[in-house]
UniProtKB/Swiss-Prot annotation:
It comes from the Eukaryota. Oligomer (believed to be a pentamer but probably hexamer). GO terms for cellular component: apoplast. Transmembrane segments: none annotated. Glycans are attached at N67. This is Putative germin-like protein 2-1. It holds the Pfam family Cupin_1. It comes from Oryza sativa subsp. japonica (Rice). It is found in: Secreted, Extracellular space, Apoplast.
Length: 216
């Protein structure tokens, strides 16, 4: 009898863990984000259906190139729930990424989304790194029409090694995928992470850490 109860409890635990391991299913056609609501939820509260218009499902602007006049030489134009309220609860978003010659989308992660990247113009060198302990690097040169997947939560990058502009379109599996740029987070946090900690982590002298932090 005890073994039967143990089996049932184990089965219940597995069922509960599976239930909470993914986003809940939609219970209605859509839930347009009410960005003025004071209700605090994971995402946005739903807008009054009577106030929803077609504009809640529309965005215009991906035909325009982003401004790549920056130190990295790249620009990301995001289309997520912040731009299209109708994306709320739908689990998807887009981004146009522009790369100047030798432009870089530096190593970063999306904590809440897998990314699938399509090259619209030009060629890119892309890659991602697996988790500890292997930290295996996967890289590929992509050309126009090629598609590449960056798994959720893994560090990845894109580099335009050529002399012409590159355009790519990224689809992400979250209405709000988030982004953490590794260098910015490690060396540009507010306040700074102690240079004692970073010097030991990277096995360099503190003055080198201080010099890097000064760039942020």
């Amino acid at each position: 009898m005890a073994s039967t109860w143990f089996f049932l409890l184990a089965l219940l635990a597995v069922s509960i863990s599976n239930a909470f391991a993914s986003d809940p299913s939609q219970l209605q056609d859509f839930c347009v984000a009410d960005k003025m609501s004071q209700v605090l939820v994971n995402g946005f509260a739903c807008k009054d259906p009577a106030a929803i218009t077609v504009e809640d499902f529309f965005f215009s602007g991906l035909h325009m190139a982003g401004n790549t006049s920056n130190r990295q030489g790249s620009a990301v134009t995001g289309v997520n729930v912040a731009q299209i309220s109708g994306l709320n609860t739908l689990g998807i978003s887009l981004a146009r990424v522009d790369y100047a010659p030798y432009g870089l989308n530096p190593p970063h992660i999306h904590p809440r989304a897998t990314e699938i990247l399509t090259i619209l113009e030009g060629s890119l060198y892309v890659g991602f790194v697996t988790s500890n302990p292997e930290n295996k690097l996967f890289t590929k040169v992509l050309n126009k029409g090629d598609v590449f997947v960056f798994p959720q939560g893994l560090i990845h990058f894109q580099f335009n090694y050529g002399t012409k502009d590159v355009i790519a379109l990224a689809a992400l599996s979250s209405q709000n995928p988030g982004v953490i740029t590794i260098a910015n987070a490690v060396f540009g946090s507010k306040p700074f992470i102690s240079d004692d900690i970073l010097a030991k982590a990277f096995q360099v002298e503190k003055k080198i850490v201080d010099r890097i932090q000064a760039q942020f």
